[in-house]
């Protein structure tokens, strides 16, 4: 069975990685792909991606390193989870970034945490949001684009409210495309 690696970058609570990996595995294992947690990476590997004026990291700069880790492990895809704030050129922030070519993605929990918005900490909500963003970025890794269905996990999240509205699953149209694309890579 092929593997998706979920790799913590910096300190990410073990329970978060475990719960996210279990959910993603519950979906992808039925499609011939298992999910496992990889060894933690130091944030210092990505210091060159830091933009001091913005106080954010360029998300795409994480992908080559994650891709190489996945390649060495024989993984089908690799997803990093970090607590640092991410951006991409032309955007104020991103929850995550993915590359189909590199078969890698990174998701930031920075803006997924309720505390970022002045709310009390809520581990269940953080897990739910992180699951949705990991499923979304994996969709991109496997060739899906954004979906107009606001309940589909592939819908673009312009804010955390958009993330909260959508479900952690692919809509029937995206599911069909994903299964077709997985047949090619498996």
From Swiss-Prot:
It comes from Thermococcus kodakarensis (strain ATCC BAA-918 / JCM 12380 / KOD1) (Pyrococcus kodakaraensis (strain KOD1)). Gene3D superfamilies: Collagenase (Catalytic Domain) (3.40.390.10). The active site is at 137 (proton acceptor). Signal peptide: none annotated. Its EC number is 3.4.-.-. This is Archaemetzincin. Probable zinc metalloprotease whose natural substrate is unknown. Belongs to the peptidase M54 family. Its cofactor is Zn(2+). HAMAP family: Archaemetzincin (MF_01842). The gene is amzA. It comes from the Archaea. It holds the Pfam family Peptidase_M54. Zn(2+) 2 binds at residues 147, 152, 171, 174. Binds 2 Zn(2+) ions per subunit. One is catalytic, whereas the other seems to have a structural role. Monomer. One of its GO terms (molecular function) is metallopeptidase activity. CDD domains: Peptidase_M54. Zn(2+) 1 binds at residues 136, 140, 146. InterPro entries: MetalloPept_cat_dom_sf, Pept_M54_archaemetzincn, Pept_M54_archaemetzncn_arc/bac. One of its GO terms (biological process) is proteolysis. The keyword Hydrolase applies. Keywords: Hydrolase, Metal-binding, Metalloprotease, Protease, Zinc.
